[in-house]
Amino acid sequence: MKHIFRATLACALSYSGYGQTDGATRADWPHYGGSQLSWRFSALDQINASNIKALAPAWIFQTGDYAEGLQATPIVVDGVMYLITARAQVFALDASNGKVLWQHRYPPPRPGVAGGLSEVQESRGLTVGFGLVFFGSSDNHLVALDQKTGREVWNVAADDPKQCGCGISAAPLLVKDKVIIGGNGGDQAHRGYLTAFYAKTGRLAWRWYVIPGAGEKGNETWKGDSWKFGGGAPWMTGSYDPALNLVYWGTGNAASDFYDGARAPSADKSKETNLYTASVVALEADTGKLRWHYQEVPDDLWDFDSSYEVILMDREVRGRMRQLLAHMSKSGLTFVLDRTTGEFLGVFSVPEVRNWISGVTEDGKLVGRNEPKPGQLADFCPSPAGAKSWNSMAYSPRTGLLYAPINEVCAALRPTDEAPQEGHSFMNSSMDFKPAPGRVNYSHLDAWDPISGKRVWSYPYKYILLASVLATAGDLVFTGDPEGDFIALNARTGDKIWSYQTGAGHRGSAMSYSVGGRQFIATPSGWQMGLVGGLVRLFPDLQVRGGSTVVAFALPEAAR
């Protein structure tokens, strides 16, 4: 069952224009996802299908920090671009010409300071507010710099990285007077959490643990004391609805990743298991209190966590606007929920090759689970790298479509039963990637109608796509590929209408802004290996180049 959606809802929906404040209608790109709604949409339309062939580099900036490429989304506020490299070097640039205004070098973590994955430095974003620039570090600190000078103003430890094995790779989310951040280490033997700090001082405001403690509601979904080491870290950036005053986050997988003998209290896989892992949660922004949850993958045995972006949209239903969210997990299942209550409204599956389940019922239950077994070789599709990686999809209110890069890669692994060691990797398996069978192209950038669950168009690509998508009011969709091509597609048809070779593979996120009435499209360029190195090795003829460059494109005056 590839497309599952309640027909009565789908037939009752119509698109009525922007309807809702997208937060990126002005010249700036102030948040990781463009706005707090996480659309990755720019309302600027100076660059469009009629003139894009004239689009050319306006300026290029080399960070000089090439380790792990450039994975971030640049932020632009009041004509200044703020950028962080994978190793947490922060730059402020004149967004009109790329000139460096200041630079801050965050010291690398000492060897052995963390218990595992957090020793890999891969900062993916920052945010700006209250005259400060906020970012997280691989040694699990949240840092605030002076926005004008780059001087450190405050620095707080979210937790002891040596104990939890965790760090911070995602961009923080600024909500009112607080900065909210999760942490990586979803595969570590620790208890994941979201933390809010007061933006001006760094003082702790609240902390919400993904896994309920002893005596708390939901703890009964864990076996014994496995909740203490159950992972679930929300390792990407969330969203915020100011009208409801709720933050929305996707949570990580349960640990250990591929074996549940120590953590699943029941063999009944139709029930919620290991709450609140592999879920979308809504929390009260002021207190961190859980308002509602929806678990997408109960008893996750495939490392199919739900940590990706949560896209908030208002759509007309039976003559009235309904407040929705769309969320894609690593599995490629895309859920549409009522964001006020968490009510399930529909789900559709995006990968073309899928064998981890046989389908989904009309009420969102997984059926035909193909579960890895200890000591046995398991093959399943998509792989734990995800049908979509952490790089974000986009939503255009002009077309009403979601745009997502999808990869067709499978995995082979053999789970083991091992005891947890606090703060250390708790995956309990080695893993090999495999090309999905019967394929010529191993990825595709798709446009999906989130209401009907139907694919509107698909742009095929021979290898893998691991960069975010940008949609604009010029009815354009931008992304980059590992060979270094930065491309633009027609948002309504999927036709490729422009490209530029940047010289290095794309792993980060393009964005758009305006300075002095001139629209820019900026993209990071620079490949990161890490886990995706295993994906690249599937394609011996794929030549991937590293780098750490921002290329900002604009139209010449005659074409504007």
What is the predicted role of each segment?
Residues 145-150, 192-204, 267-288, 337-342, ...:
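Beta-propeller blade signature
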Residues 511-560:
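Blade-level signature of beta-propeller repeat domains, shared across WD40, Kelch, NHL, RCC1
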Residues 61-73, 103-127, 152-171, 188, ...:
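Extracytoplasmic beta-rich repeat domains
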Residues 314, 406-408, 437-495:
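Loop/turn-rich, solvent-exposed surfaces of beta-rich toroidal or solenoidal domains
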